[in-house]
Amino acid sequence: LGFMACVENMTRKIPGRLVGKTTDKKGKTGYVLTLQAREQHIRREKASSNVCSNQALCALAVSVYLSAMGKEGFRNVAVQCMSKAHYMAEKLGEIGFRLEYDKEFFHEFVTVSDISSEKILTKLEENNILGGLPLDEKRILWCCTELNSKEDIDEVINILKEVK
């Protein structure tokens, strides 16, 4: 699943289904497929939307989630993800991990350590924590989301302080 933004006059050229927000006769908010001429069931030969049922189910689930969160909720989740990832990167740096890339990042980042990735992740697993993704012997890809609390991150850091 992905999100794409474009200027209004390009909406007929981008791939995928477009969902629009509308209001019904009773003033209730509703979401509908817009520009249906792009859809397979209207103009198969020129369709820019090619979605199968399992993708549509994922899109429906995300639509419900995003609708429930609203505009500010979606932004708040993004801010939480970013701030928690930067917090974790900073804390990992304090205990000897180095950032692989000196670039901006959102909620995923790669660290390098003198301790083996396997040893680090095994120690976390022993504490019922699913750590990052090992990229090789010394590098790990970490990810933080809105579901990770600062207490969770601090617990990971405290456990990693014990790894030698």
Residue ranges and their predicted role:
Residues 1-95, 99-102:
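Active-site C-terminal subdomain of aminotransferase-like
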Residues 72-155:
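Conserved C-terminal alpha-helix-loop-beta "cap" of PLP-dependent enzymes
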Residues 159-163:
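C-terminal alpha-helix
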